[in-house]
């Protein structure tokens, strides 16, 4: 499945990124998200698969397309032949809608896919999260004090706590964790949006980020877990259940224990995981979409678990004219 579909999913995220990038800086995050969703949905139906959206833009009554449970792929076209692989898909057509709307860095189009049952059907709630790279797997505990986790990370990385950089979403709810990190002596990189990109950075040696801590969306947590499976990183996460309607949503999705701490393999247990993302705006991991007179250039990341491949793909999309020139600079 991975070999067959990885480049197909590359097309999906590229088209979503290109559509979103055309709205960059317009100040309308809803429109940016809308065009990314439309582009992703359109290309998704050209992929040779029997796909089901398990994490998307919301419930059926909340989203016109890419809603949870929606069927996508060539298998659902009229008179389609049998035999397409069954695939569960998690999507975020534009992670960082505000980033795109303001032209800020690190907006991406992203999806993860797996065989049936390979991705947790997470409700659209918040999750407490801690994300670390391969060297720190097993060293952190979601219930441990921040200082203890930072000491454990520093020990695994053979450095001082003062050498560490922790990424945290810049939100009022994170005031305590920010103070705890500072009190421990570690440095902080606050980000306005894009905790998925931050999680990937924490798992890549040389990115200058050693951990991500705080509370973010549960759908992004599952997407991050898919990336961690491919990068040998770790995410620990727990749903934030604070209202009766949250309990109802968990029950509807078959989740019985709202206090459970999920490890990476529980959020993304699949054996054939594909993770694909494409830069929309310039970022620390991926370049943004670049438009020029005769085409478009995109920069993407495609990872496959079973094949153990991490590919950075630089694509030039040329205009369909006979006199078009290819440029590499």
Protein language model features and the residues they cover:
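An extended, acidic
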Residues: 143-295, 299-304
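Conserved phosphate-binding loops in N-terminal lobes of ATP-dependent enzymes
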Residues: 1-38, 109-150, 154
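Fold-independent oxyanion-binding glycine-rich loops
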Residues: 57-58, 70, 87, 91-94, ...
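Flexible, acidic active-site loops/lids enriched in D/E/S/T/G that coordinate Mg2+ and/or position polar
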Residues: 33-116
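Fe-S-dependent hydro-lyases/dehydratases of central metabolism
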Residues: 18, 25, 41, 46-65, ...
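Catalytic, metal-anchored helix/loop core of enzyme active sites in primary metabolism
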Residues: 1-6, 16-25, 48, 58-60, ...
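Short coil/turn connectors at secondary-structure junctions
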Residues: 47-51, 81-87, 95, 103-108, ...
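Extended hydrophobic packing segments that form well-structured cores
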Residues: 293-329
């Amino acid at each position: 499945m991975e070999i067959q579909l990885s480049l197909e999913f590359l097309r999906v995220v590229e088209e979503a990124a290109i559509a979103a990038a055309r709205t960059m800086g317009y100040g309308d995050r809803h429109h940016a998200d809308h065009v990314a969703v439309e582009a992703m949905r359109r290309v998704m139906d050209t992929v040779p698969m029997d796909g089901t959206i398990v994490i998307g833009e919301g419930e059926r009554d909340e989203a016109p397309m890419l809603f949870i449970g929606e069927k996508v792929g060539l298998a659902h076209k009229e008179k389609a032949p049998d035999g397409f692989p069954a695939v569960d898909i998690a999507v975020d057509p534009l992670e960082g809608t505000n980033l795109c709307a303001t032209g800020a860095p690190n907006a991406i189009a992203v999806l993860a896919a797996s065989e049936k049952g390979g991705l947790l059907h997470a409700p659209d709630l918040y999750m407490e999260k801690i994300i670390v790279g391969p060297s720190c797997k097993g060293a952190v505990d979601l219930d441990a004090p921040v200082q203890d986790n930072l000491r454990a990370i520093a020990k695994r990385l053979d450095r001082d706590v003062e050498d560490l950089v922790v990424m945290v979403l810049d939100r009022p709810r994170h005031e305590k964790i920010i103070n705890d990190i500072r009190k421990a002596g570690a440095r902080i990189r606050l980000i306005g949006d894009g905790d998925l990109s931050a999680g990937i950075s924490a798992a890549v040696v040389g990115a200058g980020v050693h951990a991500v801590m705080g509370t973010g969306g549960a759908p992004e947590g599952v997407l991050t877990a898919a990336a961690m499976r491919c990068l040998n990183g770790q995410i620990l996460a727990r749903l934030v259940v604070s209202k009766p309607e949250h309990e109802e949503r968990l029950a509807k999705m078959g989740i019985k224990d709202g206090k459970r701490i999920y490890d990476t393999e529980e959020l993304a247990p699949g054996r054939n995981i594909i993770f694909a993302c494409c830069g929309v705006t310039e970022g620390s991991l991926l370049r943004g979409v670049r438009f020029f007179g005769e085409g478009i250039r995109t920069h993407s990341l495609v990872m496959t678990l079973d094949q153990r491949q991490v590919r950075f793909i630089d694509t030039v999309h040329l205009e369909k004219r006979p006199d078009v020139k290819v440029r590499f600079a």
